[in-house]
């Protein structure tokens, strides 16, 4: 991925990125094992091929508009651009070997070539969205209830259950991504999901799920306690355990 600049080249549209990715060999045969990868970008490309509609338009129609997520998308408007927060850390994910932590120094980090701010062609399945804490919170609440904040049912309870269920066999546990362990967690269609409290390192609940972003954004949903949480930062490769600290603080108040 790094040598071919699959992630780093934001000038490619989704079709071009998948074409470049398709030139690389598979890490293993399908069903042999599980690997955190760019599979969701491949899925976005397949969705475009099947529907004949771009993934950004589908997200807008089925998620962003119904949830009133007015500040979420791949391309910022001229009105939104001045509100974009500065990114800090290291320029490329390749430079931080995705989950190897770097010295926590506030250096401004120009990521525009990787995440174009105003390119109408840029779109991905797994990275690259701009959003606000308000919008991200609306999305987290939707994953908790299946409804918009106005009460509109957007997804069936059966589908919610299918999305939340752990998909990893015991042979793929404990969950580890690029050398970083996630004790107690499996993986569902929405990110990591707590399956074994006895192995967990944070005071959470069975079925709690969520995931993080490259610049340390983070969300979690706890169906048991009916709560959600969102953290928004702009630091690539932070070495501070912010996610764990916030989970500990949140659950300490319950």
Residue ranges and their predicted role:
Residues 219-220, 225-235:
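Short, well-ordered beta-strand elements
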Residues 1-203:
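Short, surface-exposed loop or secondary-structure junction motifs
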Residues 203-209:
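Short, hydrophobic/aromatic-rich segments at coil-to-beta transitions
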Residues 173, 201, 231, 240-241:
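Short acidic, gly/pro-rich beta-turn/loop elements at beta-sheet edges
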